[in-house]
Every structure is written in C-alpha cells, then in structure tokens.
C-alpha cells in the first residue's frame, strides 16, 4: 500500500497489462466536506464472465486527467480473488483544508505480496495527502452507492459476503446516499452530528472534607510556666521599648538575646529558680486537674440502669465482720427501706465504690444489736460534691437521733489495714447465699469527719457487686479545704463476710461515742494524721521582690505575675538589667546573638 504525495486525492485501480485501464484514467473518491466515510468491504469473485471494461465505461464521466501516472506495474496479470474489507474512518476536514484525522484499515484475507504466478494480485494505491486541493475544488459532489457499483460490475454477492463495519447507534451513517444528487439536509445533519467533537464530562463526586474541629482549651487547665529566658525577655522588653519606641519586635528580640548572653550566671540562676518553682506548681496543678477530669468522666459514663444481680444475704456468726465505708459513688442511691425477713433479695446496681474496713472489736459493747447490724452491714458514704451535683432531695432524708461518730482511731485502723487482706472481687459471688437479719426499729447513721483514702481498683469491683439501699443526707462542704461531713441513714445493711486480719490494729470500744444529735460540722482533732488533698496549691516560702536588694513581699498584679512589690521596682529592675547590658557591650564582650 502506498500513499504518494500529490496535489489530488484519488483512488487508482491499475490492472497491470490491461489496455483498457491506464494510469491517467482515475476515478475520484467522493468528498463531502466534514464527514465520515465508512466503506464496507467488497468481496471480488474470480468470475470469468466478469467484464472489467464495464467499470471503465461507468466511470468515464468521472475521469480526471490530472491524476498521477503509476507506471511501476507494466506486466499483464489477471485479477486474483481478494477479500479486502477497507474502512476509512473520521476523515475530518477543516475550512483551511487541513486533514484533522484520517484512518485507513484494510483486512486482507490473502496477502498482497505473493509469489508471482499466472494471476498476481491487483495493486490498490490510495493517496490521502492534500485532499483539499483536488477534491474540494469540484463543484459537483457525487457519491457511489454500493448497490450501484455491484450492479454495474455484475458481481455475484452470494459467495462473497459483504462485511459491514460495526457501528455504534450514535455514529450510524447511511452507506447508500443518492449517486447523482448532492447531500440532503438530513444527511448534512448526520454528518454534523458525527463529525462534531464529542466531549464526555465525567462528574467526580468528591466527598466534602469535614473541617477538623479544634479542641477548645479548658479555661480551668493550668498554664505552662515560662522559661527563664521568657521571664527575662518579659522584664527587659519594656525598658528597651521605652528607650527605642520605634524598634520592631525583631530588633528588640536581638537586643534581649544579646543581653541574656552577656548576663551573669548569678542573675540567670534567679530566673532559673523561678522557672523551676513555677514548673513544680504547674505539675501539681496539672495532676489535680487531670484527677478532676477523670472523676468527671467516670461519673458521666456510669450505666444508669444496670442489670440487677440477685443475692441472698444472711447473718453468719463470724468472729469479726466489717463495716465498709465508701468515699466515691458516681450517683446517689435512694431506695425504700428493706423489710426484715428471713430471706431477702437485694438488687445491686453496678457502681464504683471505695471502702474502709472496720473490725468488729472497735464497736461499743453496749450497742449490742446495733453493733452487730453495723458490723455485719455495709455502710456506704457518698461525698457531698457528688450528691449535690446529682440533685439529691435533702429535705426528704431525715437523720436518726442516734448517731455514731467514727473518730481518729477508727479511721487510722481502717487506713492501716493492708489491702492484701481484702478478699478478691469475685469472692462474694462464690460464697453461698445468706439471709439478711436486722432490727427494723434501729436505723443508725454514721457521720464521717474525714475524707477516707483514695480509691483502689479491687475496692471498686467488690462494692459494685452488692451495694446496699441507702438514704443519704449530705451537707455541702465550704469553700475552704475542710473535712466533708456526710450523714448516712441506713435503711438496710448488707452482710459482708470478711474475716478480720490479725495484723489490723483494733481500737478500744471507748473510742466510739454516741451523740444525741447529728454532727453538722466539726473540725478534725489536731492529732489526726490524715492527709487531705485540696485543690489550692501550698503557700510558697516567704516570696520576695525580684529586684535585687529589695526584700519587700511582692504585690498582686496580673501584669507582673506577683513578682514585684511596686512599679518602681519594675522600672529599677529593668533599668539595672539594661544598664548592665550596655556596660558589657561597651567593654567589647558582646556575646553572639542567638
């Protein structure tokens, strides 16, 4: 196949050696402007009755003498049977005559180059260059119909089937326009529709990015302390700004950096000590803040309606039962009194409770049934802050006229008892059922004057199994760090079978005294050795003014962090620091800037 360059676009079929077809006799391929041609394949039968001269007679009116002569094939050969499906697709011409796209596909069942024999193949030359100069110049545009061509050639199409090229429904083009008339309007519309550039718009659905929400900084969170250099910078920048009001922040930073490098080691130690003290205070405040956050999270995540765990409680003659006092319950428990019966089922909601174990020997001997009930029972004490935050109706809870006060020895005995002597969390569930027996007339209440020790994981699990129903009255604590006064009116006391430890110190019964009235508030005895953790930081040891030579205590001022006694000391300190820096600068001992 050859594509010789010429000024005309033609399709030349030269049968070598045939006198009726020369190189000057050509027939033009129809040019219809911007359109797409799809020529179906034509199967030629080697019928001896085929007269090729009919083809020449049919195309005499289309002959053009401007064709390129091809004299490369001069021998006489016959026509060989060929199956040549030829497809020309997307011949798109613009107004300037430039070829935008052209394609030629030929499928030959027999190769063109074959060994020479009596019947060599016919050579087909297709020239597709410079299509505008030769074809677009004609005023009369004609098309060749496939059926017309087959009728003129007298081809028998039964043996050789015409393979139509596969066309999409959108790009369908009728292959049989009129051979002697110009294009109709609908054909032009089809051509425009086919040759029009198709743009496929693919909408990409992108998920909108959700902006990340920045965590709001808790105003109660303690602020990080400043470094020694930051403290020095804060103290000296005011003096530098006073002398150089037009100085930029970068210039001030360079000056302060050089001043800090030239500062004496003793003066640097002053700032470093302040930073260390501030860091210690920050760590303490941060620990308290995190503890409060954890306690709030624990309160918020408590299951309000947990499944009930039935348990049969009974009084067993053990040598030393215990009274358990809790310090931290996520929410208040207020349930009706449990009637005294040989067997009673108590629903136990899951709660996080700490406990204090008190041996039986510390209870007074005179309070026989009360002592047994209290020793066999579990008394739960709820802090005032938790109950008041949950909205406990205090008016509905009335205390009993009889109250027992747990004094220092009771708390010390409970705190000194080692945790390893406590039964594991699942021990209660493995014990046999027991009956609850208690006197319904006696409803003692316990007033605790001191905060019990912190929680332990084993204590939380243990008391979450079988807490007793209680009615509780809480007196909110004052703002100052004072012991919480919690009054508990016991409705029903659960039995806990815990053997007493021989290592636990037993206090004499005289340590307990019965009060005729409920203790509202009372300061702890001076000999109490119980540490209270309060939110207020410990007082610093004799703070003094930062300015050297001034021994006055600092005055509270938010601008200077309570470090100076007056504004005069602030100015003097900054001036002294600045003057010392100027003196070192004049001596030529200026240190490099950071």
UniProtKB/Swiss-Prot annotation:
Molecular-function GO terms, alphabetical: chromatin DNA binding
Motif Nuclear localization signal mapped to chain: 212-217
Complex formation: Component of the PNUTS-PP1 phosphatase complex.
UniProt cross-references to InterPro entries, sorted A to Z: HMG_box_dom, HMG_box_dom_sf, TOX_HMG-box_domain
DNA-binding region(s) from the entry: 222-290
Cellular location(s): Nucleus; Chromosome
Major location (coarse): nucleus
Region (Disordered): 160-225, 522-545
PROSITE patterns: HMG_BOX_2 (PS50118)
GO cellular component: nucleus; PTW/PP1 phosphatase complex
GO biological process: positive regulation of transcription elongation by RNA polymerase II; regulation of transcription by RNA polymerase II; RNA polymerase II promoter clearance
SUPFAM superfamilies assigned: HMG-box
Protein name: TOX high mobility group box family member 4-B
Biological role stated in the UniProt entry: Transcription factor that modulates cell fate reprogramming from the somatic state to the pluripotent and neuronal fate. Also acts as a regulatory component of protein phosphatase 1 (PP1) complexes. Component of the PNUTS-PP1 protein phosphatase complex, a PP1 complex that regulates RNA polymerase II transcription pause-release. PNUTS-PP1 also plays a role in the control of chromatin structure and cell cycle progression during the transition from mitosis into interphase.
Alphabetically ordered keywords of this record: Chromosome, DNA-binding, Nucleus, Phosphoprotein
């Amino acid at each position: 196949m050859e594509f010789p360059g010429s000024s005309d676009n033609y399709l030349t079929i030269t049968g070598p050696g045939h006198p009726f077809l020369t190189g000057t006799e050509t027939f033009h391929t129809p040019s219809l402007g911007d359109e797409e041609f799809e020529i179906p394949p034509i199967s030629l039968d080697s019928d001896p009755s085929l007269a090729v001269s009919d083809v020449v007679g049919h195309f005499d009116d289309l002959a053009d003498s401007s064709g390129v002569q091809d004299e490369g094939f001069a021998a006489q050969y016959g026509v060989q049977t060929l199956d040549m499906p030829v497809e020309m697709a997307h011949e798109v011409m613009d107004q300037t005559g430039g070829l935008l796209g052209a394609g030629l596909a030929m499928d030959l069942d027999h190769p063109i180059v074959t060994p020479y024999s009596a019947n060599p193949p016919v050579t087909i030359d297709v020239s597709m260059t410079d299509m505008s100069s030769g074809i677009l110049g004609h005023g009369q545009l004609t098309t060749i119909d496939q059926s017309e061509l087959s009728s003129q050639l007298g081809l028998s199409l039964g043996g050789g089937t015409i393979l139509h090229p596969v066309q999409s429904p959108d790009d369908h083009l009728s292959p049989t326009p009129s051979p002697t008339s110009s294009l109709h309007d609908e054909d032009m519309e089809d051509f425009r529709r086919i040759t029009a550039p198709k743009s496929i718009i693919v909408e990409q659905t992108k998920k909108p990015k959700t902006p990340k929400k920045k965590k709001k900084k808790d105003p109660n969170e303690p602020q990080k302390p400043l470094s020694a250099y930051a403290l020095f910078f804060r103290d000296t920048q005011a003096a530098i700004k006073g002398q150089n009001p037009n100085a930029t922040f970068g210039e001030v930073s360079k000056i302060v950096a050089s001043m800090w490098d030239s500062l004496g080691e003793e003066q640097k130690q002053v700032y470093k000590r302040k930073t260390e003290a501030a860091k210690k205070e920050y760590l303490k405040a941060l620990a308290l803040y995190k503890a409060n956050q954890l306690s709030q999270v624990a309160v918020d995540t408590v299951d309000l309606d947990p499944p009930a765990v039935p348990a049969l409680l009974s009084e067993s003659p053990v040598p030393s039962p215990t009274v358990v006092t809790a310090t931290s319950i996520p929410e208040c428990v207020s349930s009706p009194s449990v009637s005294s019966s040989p067997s009673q089922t108590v629903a136990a909601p899951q709660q996080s409770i700490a406990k204090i174990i008190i041996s039986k020997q510390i209870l007074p001997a005179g309070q026989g049934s009360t002592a047994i009930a209290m020793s066999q029972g579990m008394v739960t004490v709820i802090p005032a802050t938790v109950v008041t935050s949950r909205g406990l109706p205090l008016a509905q809870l009335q205390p009993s006229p009889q109250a027992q006060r747990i004094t220092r020895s009771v708390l010390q005995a409970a705190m000194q008892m080692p945790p390893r002597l406590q039964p594991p969390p699942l021990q209660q569930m493995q014990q046999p059922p027991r009956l609850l027996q208690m006197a319904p007339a006696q409803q003692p209440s316990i007033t605790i004057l001191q905060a019990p020790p912190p929680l332990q994981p084993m204590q939380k699990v243990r008391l979450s199994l079988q807490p007793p129903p209680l009615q509780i009255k809480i007196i909110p604590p004052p703002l100052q760090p004072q012991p919480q006064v919690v009054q508990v009116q016991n409705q029903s006391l659960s039995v806990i079978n815990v053997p007493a430890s021989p290592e636990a110190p037993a206090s004499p019964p005289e340590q307990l005294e019965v009060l005729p009235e409920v203790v509202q508030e009372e300061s702890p005895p001076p000999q109490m050795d119980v540490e209270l953790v309060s939110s207020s930081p410990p007082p610093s040891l004799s703070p003094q003014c930062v300015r050297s030579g001034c021994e006055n205590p600092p005055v509270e001022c938010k601008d200077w962090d309570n470090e100076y006694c007056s504004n005069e000391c602030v100015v003097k300190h900054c001036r002294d620091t600045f003057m010392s820096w100027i003196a070192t600068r004049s001596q030529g001992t200026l240190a490099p800037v950071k």
